UniProtKB/Swiss-Prot annotation:
Protein name: 4-hydroxy-3-methylbut-2-enyl diphosphate reductase
Keywords: 4Fe-4S, Iron, Iron-sulfur, Isoprene biosynthesis, Metal-binding, Oxidoreductase
Pathway annotation from the record: Isoprenoid biosynthesis; dimethylallyl diphosphate biosynthesis; dimethylallyl diphosphate from (2E)-4-hydroxy-3-methylbutenyl diphosphate: step 1/1; Isoprenoid biosynthesis; isopentenyl diphosphate biosynthesis via DXP pathway; isopentenyl diphosphate from 1-deoxy-D-xylulose 5-phosphate: step 6/6
Xref: InterPro entries: LytB/IspH
Active site: E133
Source species of the chain: Beijerinckia indica subsp. indica (strain ATCC 9039 / DSM 1715 / NCIMB 8712)
Signal sequence, start to end: none
Transmembrane spans: none
Protein encoded by which gene: ispH
HAMAP family with a match to the protein in the record: IspH
Enzyme Commission number: 1.17.7.4
Residue numbers binding dimethylallyl diphosphate: H47, H81, H131, S230, S231, N232, S275
Family: Belongs to the IspH family.
Length: 319
């Protein structure tokens, strides 16, 4: 007999790593295998401190700007979030061996923005100021060519060059519902604005939010495993709250769980952001198993079979 209280855990599926994150992490690990340590990485390769520390232990050196990289023949890898065009240009001017691990779905947004600009349209970017992905997208075109909009209120007062010659793109890790509201506000204010042929919100962001929406109303609490600087992880927590979960928390490790808040629950949802490894979910599950008698159920809302090949330089070097 056990004197532990019972806890019904609902595991969201899909959760955790997406194809772009797997590609970026694999790029660093493959570069370390091919070229040896150190390998330099501009910005956190993905927004997860556990992943970054693990790569540091293998010989990766993380920098924020290229001026922190010494003259070297070792590769410098650009993170999954993408970079402004000035960064590859700076790397080329210094003869730096650069490997671009930008997620292909982010690159798609870059190319859309360029295409609209080349066709004479002013580009609006829906996103969060300061996020590396937004910085990278803004930096694809000459300064001032893209207008960043963050709220429907900003759209109401937005000054554009020509209301009949506009296009929009979006950050890939936003809330699906928030983005839908932004697009509705854009099309209401600017009826002739052109959008992407397919949604810019990435498949993994959409799928993880849909899984949270499914279980959030029926659990006492929900944990999102991820780093505080991860946009898609923060959006999962917000989606849980908006979907009716009264207690939603973002945690990186089991040590981050505020156990007093969870002492009287009988059901718990668990998901993980697209940059959070499954080992952290397992760690948190084990910590709950020490305190509760667990009954675990997986709630699946989508099947993911997406794969992105490594950057060309790494594929060629390995062949």
């Amino acid at each position: 007999m056990t004197d532990k209280p019972k806890l019904h855990i609902l595991l969201c599926a899909p959760r955790g790593f997406c194809a772009g994150v797997v590609r970026a992490i694999d790029a660093v690990e493959q570069a370390l295998r091919l070229y040896g340590a150190p390998v330099y990485v501009r910005h956190e390769i993905v927004h997860n401190k556990f992943v970054v520390e693990g790569l540091k232990a293998k010989g990766a050196i993380f920098v924020e700007e290229l001026d922190e990289v010494p003259d070297t023949d070792k590769p410098v890898i650009f993170s999954a979030h993408g970079v402004p065009k000035s960064i590859p240009a700076e790397a080329q001017s210094r003869n730096i061996f650069a490997i671009d691990a930008t997620c292909p779905l982010v690159t798609k947004v870059h190319r859309e923005a360029e295409l609209h600009h080349n066709n004479g349209r002013q580009v609006l970017l829906v996103g969060h100021a300061g996020h590396p992905e937004v910085v990278g997208t803004l930096g694809q075109l000459p300064e001032g060519s893209i207008l960043l909009v963050q709220t429907p209120g900003e759209i109401e007062t937005l000054q554009v060059k020509d209301e009949k010659n506009l296009a929009y793109v979006t950050q890939t890790t936003l809330s699906v519902d928030d983005t839908r509201n932004m697009v509705e506000a854009l099309t209401k204010r600017f009826p002739e604005i052109i959008g992407p042929h397919r949604e810019d919100i990435c498949y993994a962001t959409t799928n993880r939010q849909e899984a949270v929406k499914r279980i959030a109303p029926i659990v006492d609490a929900l944990l999102v495993v991820g780093s505080s600087n991860s946009s898609n992880s923060q959006r999962l927590r917000e989606v849980a709250e908006r979907s009716g979960c009264k207690l939603a928390r973002l945690v990186l490790r089991a040590d981050d769980v505020e156990w007093d808040l969870f002492s009287n629950i009988s059901s718990l949802g668990i998901t993980a952001g697209a940059s959070a490894p499954e080992v952290l979910v397992e760690e948190i599950m084990a910590a709950f198993a020490e305190r509760f008698e667990l009954e675990v159920e997986t709630v699946s809302t989508a099947d993911e079979g997406v794969f992105f090949p490594l950057p060309r330089e790494l594929r060629q070097a390995a062949s």
